Amino acid sequence: MGFTEAVRTVLKQKYATFSGRASRSEYWWFMLFYVLTAFTISFVAGLTGTFSGLQGGISALATVFLVIGGLFIVALILPLISLQVRRFHDRNMSGWWYLALVILSMVPYVGLIASLAVLVTNLLPGTEGPNKFGPDPLRPEARAEVFA
């Protein structure tokens, strides 16, 4: 799965789909899209805010980009969580483990370990063949079932 296909899949086909599995490529391509877009919005908001700060206030343009950034984050909360749950499913793990790790990440020092656990889970390949969460997203027969 390439960049465009991953973004299209997450935003159009599986926006709030918590069932099934997400391959590593789907996950990492979408995360790249998310990080690049968030960085671009933040960078432009920072630039417009920096130049308006010289005049003693925040410009309307900086405010617009801050609002766009906020809306972007709110709009992608659900697909990001569903993508993470489906990535856990690909490892044959319940999505509830993600909730447990998010809660643990709020505890000082434990949060670092919980974040590393999520990172390692996302880096490891999914289980081969079908598992209790669905068919293998990397196998052609699995794709044929999904797009049939």
Task: Label each PLM-derived region with a short phrase.
Residues M1-F33, L80-W97, V120-A148:
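Membrane-interface extramembranous regions at the lipid-water interface
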Residues E26-G53, L61-Q84, S94-L123:
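Hydrophobic alpha-helical transmembrane segments in multi-pass membrane proteins
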Residues T50-A60, P130-N131, A142-A144:
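Short, surface-exposed, charge-dense and proline/glycine-enriched linear segments
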Residues M1-A6, V10, S52-Q55, S59, ...:
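Coil-to-alpha-helix initiation sites in intrinsically disordered, low-complexity, charged segments
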